[in-house]
């Protein structure tokens, strides 16, 4: 294997916008700032909301239905 091709790995402190901090390994530096983490992400907290896209699909089909018709 080649020598000196791997990036330097630091013990970093990850700081989230929600205030959560964790010790992680990083090649970016010693302080890493993130906007969202597993402590505040809706998927992990169970506060997900479902988005009803049925109306959007119907609008799309109605709008482009005339392009599929033959004259």
Curated annotation (Swiss-Prot):
One of its GO terms (molecular function) is rRNA binding. Binds the 23S rRNA. The keyword RNA-binding applies. Belongs to the bacterial ribosomal protein bL31 family. Type A subfamily. It comes from Nitratidesulfovibrio vulgaris (strain ATCC 29579 / DSM 644 / CCUG 34227 / NCIMB 8303 / VKM B-1760 / Hildenborough) (Desulfovibrio vulgaris). SUPFAM superfamilies: L28p-like. Part of the 50S ribosomal subunit. It holds the Pfam family Ribosomal_L31. GO terms for cellular component: ribonucleoprotein complex; ribosome. Zn(2+) binds at residues 16, 18, 37, 40. The gene is rpmE. Keywords: Metal-binding, Ribonucleoprotein, Ribosomal protein, RNA-binding, rRNA-binding, Zinc. Its cofactor is Zn(2+). This is Large ribosomal subunit protein bL31. Binds 1 zinc ion per subunit. GO terms for biological process: translation. Signal peptide: none annotated. The keyword Ribosomal protein applies.
